[in-house]
Amino acid sequence: MKIAQPKPFTFEGGKRAVLLLHGFTGNSADVRMLGRYLEKEGYTCHAPQYKGHGVPPEELVHTGPEDWWQDALNGYHFLKNRGFEEIAVAGLSLGGVFSLKLGYTVPIKGIVPMCAPMYIKSEEVMYQGILEYARDYKSREGKSEEQVEMEMEQFKKTPMKTLKALQAVISDVRNHVDLIYAPTFVVQGRHDKMINTESANIIYNEVESPIKEIKWYEESGHVITFDKERDQLHEDIYRFLEKLDWQD
């Protein structure tokens, strides 16, 4: 059974634009509900789909953070080319790391990093995450358990250069967070087991913006956009965006 591939999306809402960035091994569906909510509130939202994501896992390991960063940057320029002068960005996990990187690379109206890591717990945790993604993908293709196991054995032999590169990107962004002057709203799920949640405090403390907030979601885990407090999250992000000094 072929799995329907998630695609980039653009929801035309109004003159204010928000770039939405998904996480590592995730896809644009991770930020789709948030995009729909913001569209209803008058924001135009665009979410790119990173190369090697939402496709068979064998393709993921042949791409890397440089490709994904380029996809994020292209998403920003996509909105610019559509005539949007002021762009805010919200990103989940690795998308949150990229949202911070955009904050010191190009003009950004406001930044919402959600469960964004500033250091990796361990390569092992990330490696397990990739294996879980691979297994889940293969199961959803309707393959038998035997077939999935056989393919997983092969998959485990694939060199994972991606993980080292990912760590390097995260640590590079961490070293530059103090170059961010755009208003920032740091979002973190209290029950996040995927990253070290101290990352949220690091971002909040090191961002130089005079306008910054942090909120801990007590009932949520890592993929906070799908978790039980998502409605509250949508409202909080909207409230933050409304406070920005838009020129329209």
State where each predicted segment sits:
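Gly/Ala-rich beta-loop-alpha elbow adjacent to hydrolase catalytic centers
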Residues: G91-G95, S99
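Catalytic active-site module of serine/aspartate enzymes centered on a nucleophile-bearing elbow/loop
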Residues: E219-D248
